[in-house]
Amino acid sequence: MFISKAKYFFQLILSLTFGICGVFAFSPYDFWPLSIISITGLLIIILSNITWKQIIWNTLFWGIGFFSVGLHWIYIGIDQFIPTHKNMNFFLIAFLIIYLTCYSVLFSIILVTLRLFITQWSFLSITAATLWLIIDRLRGNEFIGFPWLQFGYSQISGPIRGIGPLLGVEGITFCLVLISSLLALSIRTVQPSPYYISLIILACLYPLSWIQWYQVQPQRMTTIALVQGNINQHLYWNTENIQKTLKIYLQHTLPLLGKVKIIIWPESAIPGNELAHNELLVSLDYQLRKHHTYLITGIIDSRLINNSYYHHYNSIIVLGNTHDPYKYPSSNRYDKHHLVLCSERFPLQCLFEPVFRFFNIPIAFMKSGPYIQSQLNVYPIKMTASICYEIILGNQIRDNFKLDSDFLLTLANDVWFGCSIGPWQHLQIARMRALELGRPILFCTNNGVTAIINADGSIQSQLSQFISTTLITNISPTTGFTPYAQFGSWWLLIISILICIFIIYIQKNQLFKIFTFFKKNK
């Protein structure tokens, strides 16, 4: 009895360890083989257990290890900038971790159930990869919609990164789980065949990274400056510090007028609402047009509705357009669509907002911009824009992406997460978007990591964190459509589900036997 309990406890610790080691496959560590080890370890453990209790608890420990270490930076943001009790902060992050872990538990329960009648290891491997893909879709789209820490991102510098332009990050994740499940079954059944097949798959996928799906346009090379203000978030919205904040950005910007084509400031670089800074924006726009330089900046836009209340938008605007001088509200803008839960939007917001408005309670609810928006025009450059968290939403970025897009643009403010791994994971996700769509990304943040990302996902240049400085570089736009940009990854999901249905169909005799057995022993 003691040996049995000790073995069970050891399994739980092992599951926790496998979950934790998966985090080190992501940035800033970037040791990509650990993703395979983490998934393989989970599969070996759940396929080795015979009771539902063991399967559920081991998966829980794996998920807690993976998500608590991988997402601990969220607690930093909550603890430093949201005025709630520490116990409440801990409860919020614990709830998020358990919620995300439930998706891993769902995967394990369904996979072990299917294993009862899917007897061939090749069928089980495909089923595991398809099931993981479906669960990842659910985690990324349902309820709070949080697709962070998808294992495909860990391969941005790995040997199967070439799948990115074909099938996106989901395709990479699918192949990772397929390879991991083959390794797990090889170890579990002591058969060499699955192991050899996993090596063959890896060898076949590696040459895909040699294909260049885009064409560089060196004749259109542009000089771009990304300004990293490094503004203290505690002082950001303090009215006494607004002029100081603007002074920092202007000190970096004014000497560059006429020397660079495009200057970029980060998310909400200009404190306060757009209309309140109209005089500054008009004056700055005049100076920019005079020197033939563009400025792209983040700003909060407060629009008066029916002369009674305001709609607030997290926006990006463009100044310096010689074809169209700035005038509020300018059409050359982007309004953030996907708002962050408990920061920019709140649960049941549609119910509470009219109540707060009726009692004149000063709560600044943010509004979403349209899902599909026009590109930013920085003549003759066109950019597909996103703000902060939105860069993780691959489908939204792809749906807004156009064939004539020259660059992808992301403005962010990761000061919330201090010197944690969060900003590095954010940058890694942006690198994957560049690889998927074959376009360079201009990634400008308040305190880092500000970077220029090439169309193949590699980093051309970047700034150190926590300093106020400017990144100036020459970069060429690219053209061309990757297969992922044209078709997305839906067809992978559909084909995988059809294969699984076929597998279940040809295994129907085994399914019937199991059903009969349970019916007799009911």
Swiss-Prot record:
EC assignment: the record states: 2.3.1.269
Q: Which enzyme class? A: transferase
Q: Could you tell me the superkingdom of the organism this chain comes from?
A: Bacteria
* UniProt keyword Acyltransferase, yes or no: yes
The record gives the membrane topology as: Multi-pass membrane protein
GO BP: lipoprotein biosynthetic process
Question: What Gene3D superfamilies has UniProt attached to this entry?
Answer: Carbon-nitrogen hydrolase
Q: Name one GO cellular component term.
A: plasma membrane
A Pfam family matched in the record: LNT_N
Q: Name the Gene Ontology molecular function terms of this record.
A: ATP binding; N-acyltransferase activity
Which positions are catalytic residues?
Answer: 267 (proton acceptor), 336, 388 (nucleophile)
Q: Which residues cross the membrane?
A: 8-28, 31-51, 55-75, 90-110, 116-136, 163-183, 194-214, 486-506
Cite the SUPFAM superfamilies for this sequence: ABC transporter transmembrane region (SSF90123), Carbon-nitrogen hydrolase (SSF56317)
Q: Where in the cell is it found?
A: Cell inner membrane
Q: Which UniProt keywords apply?
A: Acyltransferase, Cell inner membrane, Cell membrane, Membrane, Transferase, Transmembrane, Transmembrane helix
**Domain CN hydrolase per the UniProt entry, residue ranges:** 227-477
Q: In which pathway does it act?
A: Protein modification; lipoprotein biosynthesis (N-acyl transfer)
Which NCBIfam families has this protein been placed in? lnt
Task: Please state which protein family the record places this protein in.
Answer: Belongs to the CN hydrolase family. Apolipoprotein N-acyltransferase subfamily.
Function of the molecule:
Catalyzes the phospholipid dependent N-acylation of the N-terminal cysteine of apolipoprotein, the last step in lipoprotein maturation.
Q: What is this protein called?
A: Apolipoprotein N-acyltransferase
Q: What's the gene?
A: lnt
